[in-house]
Amino acid sequence: MSEQTPNLKLTGKDLINIGIFSAIYFVLSFVGMFLAIIPVLWIIMPGIIAILSGIPFMLLCVKVQKPGVPLLMGLITGLLYYVTGQFTMVILATFVIGCVLSEIVRWRSKYGSFKWNTVAFILFSYGMTGSPLPIWLFKDSFFTQIADQGMPEAYVTTMESLSSIPMFVVMILTPIIGGLIGAYLARGIFKKHFKKAGMI
């Protein structure tokens, strides 16, 4: 008797779950973005958001072991950020790259592995690096822009002092550290759900 092929088509219930958990992710990431008022926290913000959002992302991966989760979550979150005026072309680029890579990892691992869903979450979390990334990408023009927008001189000066290569490395590492903490925190709190889904 041939093995039954699992149904990987998203149902109405799946889409509702994706919508709900995407909204929760947006709220948590939006709260994290307020950390940008403190320069050093803006640098590590992608990692902090990963810690905060590990539960909704990983629980959604448990509930919907099908393709489309990172892409749809990224699309919904991106639209919400666009509506609130918080979206830039850099964030758009990092979000798209992070979502696509996350989707590929889940697809290659057949959706049911905690380890690979954690990797997918880390890649997804790199989408938020688009917020502090202009500090290094555009540097002088970026600092001129935020000064023209009315940011205090002390804030701009502090940001300039943080725009070093070592701090860039720190920023790049934060989604990995935060993603691991967020994923294991989610599994620790909702162990029964992960065990039932075979993600232990």
Feature locations, PLM:
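Short helix-perturbing small/polar motifs within transmembrane alpha-helices
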Residues: 27, 94-133, 183
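Membrane-embedded alpha-helical hairpins and interfacial helices in multi-pass inner-membrane proteins
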Residues: 118-191
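Interfacial aromatic-anchored transmembrane helix boundaries in multi-pass membrane proteins
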Residues: 34-42, 77-104
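Hydrophobic transmembrane alpha-helices
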Residues: 2-68, 72
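Membrane topogenic helices and adjacent juxtamembrane segments
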Residues: 1-33, 146-155, 162-170, 187, ...
